[in-house]
Structures are given as structure tokens and as C-alpha cells.
Amino acid sequence: MNSSRRQEGSPLDLNNLPDEFGKQTVESSTTTAASSAEASRVTKKKSNGGKDEAGKVYECRFCSLKFCKSQALGGHMNRHRQERETETLNRARQLVFGNDSLAAVGAQLNFRDVNMGGGGAAAPPPTMQMGGGGFRGGGVGGDPCIPLRPVQPRLSPPQPPPYHHYLYTTTAPPSALHPMSYPATYPAPPRHQQPAAVGDYVIGHAVSAGDALVAPPPPPHRASFSCFGAPLAAPPANVQPDNGNCNCSFGCGHSNRNVNAAS
């Protein structure tokens, strides 16, 4: 019985072991040893990498600050970039506002120059001194000021009074002469010139208070009449020498004189 059982072979029997039993155990032991060695190597690498990161220092290139982690350095650099962007924006705004203010001041200067009659002319310098009132114009705080220009009203020269021609009789004294207005059809004689005598009448002009009208004496033996504007060679047809009336068409018919008495 016992011998038959041994021949059948039981797995617990050490005398009846298979031939490959020892090889399997050796292989399993070698695989477990290799896996444990690899795991130890990975842990060593991790531990060495942590030591390297802990010992490295990161420095900022803007303010020379040092950080232990790269994440902290990145946040710090972002702040520096934001500050630089705000500075550039402020500079651009200042330039834009400065150009706008200068353009507005130039437009005001040109508009005022046009109103003062100096359109198209260049604006004068902002500083000016005037002798009479002691006024000094200048820019305050970079804002130019317009100099004061003395504006003098244009006075037209006084026009001379219109010349009126008058007719005077020569038989009456100068104080009793009565001038008669007569429309001027010919240019008046210049001032300070002795009026010419035509027949028994004197053609003159308006004189001032200081001037004296001196009539030349009439011709001794001349009883003919003439009218202003009529030819001197022959008397006009409407003149009657017998009764001494001057019937001119110019409105001098009311001045009558007796020729016979004068002769």
C-alpha cells in the first residue's frame, strides 16, 4: 500500500520532486530582486531631483530679487510688465494731451489775429513791452499771451467846403455887396487869386473870414452886359440894353441896374 502511494507521487513528498521545480523558484527570486532594484533607483532619482530644486535660486532681471521657486519669479515678472505697460500708456496720454493743447492755443492765436486785421501774418512773439502804459505781456505757465496792439482809428482828412460862385455888382461899395448863389458849371478859380471881371459883374467864390474880396474898378465907358456862361463877343438875344435888365435863364433876372445912371 505504502509503495503504491509513493509511486503515485504527491506534491508534498520531497523524494518525488519534478525536475523543473528548482528552476522556477530561482527565476521568481531573480525577478523580484530586479523589480526591487528598479524601485530603489526611482526613489533615489526623485530624492536627488528634490534636492536640486531646493538648492537652486531664481533671480529677477528687473529688480535683482531672488526666489526659491520659478512660480514666484513668474508672478513677480508679471507685475513688472504691468507697471511698464501703465507707464507707456501714461506717456502716450501726456503726449496726446500736450499736442491737443498746443493745437488749440495756435487756433486761438490765428483767430484773434484775423479779428484784429492781421490774417495771414505770423503770430508775434509772446513777450512785448509798451512804453506808454508800462504793459508787459508774456506767457504764464507755458501758455503764451497775445501782445496788445494799439489800434488807432483812421481819421479821414477834413473835406474843404464846397465852392459857390457868386455875382457881385461893381457900382456898389464892397460892404453893400449881396452875393447870389449860382450853380457851378465850370471849375472854380484857385484860392488867393484875384477874380476876373466880365462886363459889369465880378465872378468870385466863397471866401473865409480872413480873406478880403477886392473888386477891380469897372471900365469907364462900357455899358454892355454879359451873363456867366454866355459868349463875350456878342450879347445874348434876350438881353435888352435900353432898360438894363439881365434876363438870363440862370435865375439872375432880379438884379437890375440902370445903365444910363451908371454911364
Curated annotation (Swiss-Prot):
Residues 25-40 have a biased composition (Low complexity). One of its GO terms (molecular function) is DNA-binding transcription factor activity. It comes from the Eukaryota. A zinc finger (C2H2-type) spans 58-80. Its main location: nucleus. Disruption phenotype: Male sterility. Increased number of inflorescence branches, modified floral organ identities, flowers with varied numbers of inner floral organs and amorphous tissues without floral organ identity in whorls 3 and 4. Malformation of leaf blades until the fourth-leaf stage. The keyword Zinc-finger applies. Keywords: Developmental protein, Differentiation, Metal-binding, Nucleus, Zinc, Zinc-finger. GO terms for biological process: cell differentiation; floral organ development; negative regulation of cell population proliferation; specification of carpel identity; specification of stamen identity. This is Zinc finger protein STAMENLESS 1. The gene is SL1.
